[in-house]
């Protein structure tokens, strides 16, 4: 593992899946997981890293699944947006309990619950050392929270989008099905598309590619992995315009 003395990133957009908050519960939010994530984010803030956060809603609701069962997709996606707000409220509370100043913003109006997303305010809050949680996706149906993460990452001029998953990075195949699958340490955007690797949905991925924002995929369940990524160590998979070095 390579070790850098200084953080590799100044400002990040951290994308957490809703499923990551479930832990072993199978549904909803596991308070132990929430508190652990809050502590890891706190460690970054204490290092001077500016942290924007997008959380999915799959632990509470999945609009696409109900759309297949007959529900109007727009309605389903709107319910999914509200699920991300619920997760955002839970994470804000966990961060406040960890004594981390945090602001929750929503892409849709929810007066009395959280403030409406405003780009300039978000930048100011990040510069002042607050964690900013971006909820309700992009505010539009048919767009995933991965798209929201890339969009907000580009808007706040983040140095990278860090996608926290349950696996150690991007593999050549599903490691659950093939234990011999190769874990990539680095990939180019084009290689991901050519190999049809599942990193995030195409709309989100091409948005990141077109705006040249690197994507780091890592295992959030691995202790110290988030800090390792921030320090620029060879943790997980980094995706950028740089071609992969063949070994």
UniProtKB/Swiss-Prot annotation:
Disulfide bonds: none annotated. It holds the Pfam family AA_kinase. Its EC number is 2.7.4.22. Residues 23-28 are annotated as: Involved in allosteric activation by GTP. It catalyses: UMP + ATP = UDP + ADP. InterPro entries: AceGlu_kinase-like_sf (IPR036393), Asp/Glu/Uridylate_kinase (IPR001048), Uridylate_kinase (IPR011817), Uridylate_kinase_bac (IPR015963). Allosterically activated by GTP. Inhibited by UTP. ATP binds at residues 15-18, 58, 62, 165, 171, 174. It comes from the Bacteria. UMP binds at residues 57, 77, 138-145. GO terms for molecular function: ATP binding; UMP kinase activity. One of its GO terms (cellular component) is cytosol. One of its GO terms (biological process) is UDP biosynthetic process. Keywords: Allosteric enzyme, ATP-binding, Cytoplasm, Kinase, Nucleotide-binding, Pyrimidine biosynthesis, Transferase. Pathway: Pyrimidine metabolism; CTP biosynthesis via de novo pathway; UDP from UMP (UMPK route): step 1/1. Belongs to the UMP kinase family. Homohexamer. Catalyzes the reversible phosphorylation of UMP to UDP. This is Uridylate kinase. The gene is pyrH.
């Amino acid at each position: 593992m390579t070790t850098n003395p200084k953080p590799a990133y100044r400002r990040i957009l951290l994308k957490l899946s809703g499923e990551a908050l479930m832990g072993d519960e199978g549904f909803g939010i596991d308070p132990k997981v929430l508190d652990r994530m809050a502590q890891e984010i706190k460690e970054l803030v204490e290092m001077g890293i500016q942290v924007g956060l997008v959380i999915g809603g799959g632990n509470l609701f999945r609009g696409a699944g109900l759309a297949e069962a007959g529900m109007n997709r727009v309605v389903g996606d709107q319910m999914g947006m509200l699920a991300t707000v619920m997760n955002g409220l839970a994470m804000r509370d966990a961060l406040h309990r960890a004594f981390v100043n945090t602001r929750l913003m929503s892409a849709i109006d929810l007066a009395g619950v959280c403030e409406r997303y405003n780009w300039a305010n978000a930048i100011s809050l990040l510069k002042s050392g607050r964690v900013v949680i971006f909820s309700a996706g992009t505010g539009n149906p048919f767009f995933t929270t991965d798209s929201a993460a890339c969009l907000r990452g580009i808007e706040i001029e983040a140095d990278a989008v860090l996608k926290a998953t349950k696996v150690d990075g991007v593999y050549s195949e599903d490691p659950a099905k093939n234990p011999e699958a190769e874990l990539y340490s680095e990939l180019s955007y084009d290689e991901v598309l050519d190999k049809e690797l599942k990193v995030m949905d195409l709309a989100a991925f091409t948005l990141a590619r077109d705006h040249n924002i690197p994507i780091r995929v890592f295992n959030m369940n691995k202790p110290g992995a988030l800090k390792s990524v921030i320090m620029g160590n060879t943790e997980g998979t980094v995706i950028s315009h740089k071609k992969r070095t063949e070994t």
